[in-house]
């Protein structure tokens, strides 16, 4: 939430597991993004997993910031972060660090807790500037 109490959100095209002990994730964001200034160390965020049924939410959070939360139901999670119950799951995390690289930044977050709301239908993947679902499993990693 902003200091004025407005919710903040954006679509991260890549969220990556960074470590398991402690549990860490990372994401990248353009420094010119309207959400960037709010991703300071100590800030709480909700990272939602998306599937084919929630593609609309990825598109909504990538739209103009004035429209991101219009006509969308969400609950107030820890530290008042927006949590969307329509998604398969959510990870609550705290920003550990922010490293600026050229006009972008790498955000490292500590995973605090997670919640599952339902089973994902078809996981959503962002690839070559478009949304896709996963295809056939090619090989197990033994």
Task: Place the predicted regions along the sequence by residue.
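Basic, polyanion-binding surface patches
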Residues: 1-142
């Amino acid at each position: 939430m902003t200091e004025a109490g407005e919710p903040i959100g954006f679509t991260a095209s890549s969220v990556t597991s960074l470590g398991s002990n402690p549990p860490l994730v990372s994401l990248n964001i353009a420094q010119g993004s309207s959400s960037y200034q709010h991703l300071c160390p100590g800030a709480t965020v909700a990272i939602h997993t998306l599937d084919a049924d929630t593609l609309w939410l990825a598109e909504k959070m990538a739209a103009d910031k004035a429209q991101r939360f219009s006509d969308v139901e969400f609950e107030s999670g820890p530290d008042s972060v927006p949590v969307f119950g329509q998604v398969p799951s959510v990870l609550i995390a705290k920003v550990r660090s922010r490293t600026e690289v050229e006009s972008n930044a790498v955000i490292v977050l500590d995973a605090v807790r997670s919640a599952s709301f339902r089973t994902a239908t078809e996981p959503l993947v962002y690839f070559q500037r478009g949304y896709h679902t996963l295809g056939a499993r090619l090989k197990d990693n033994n």
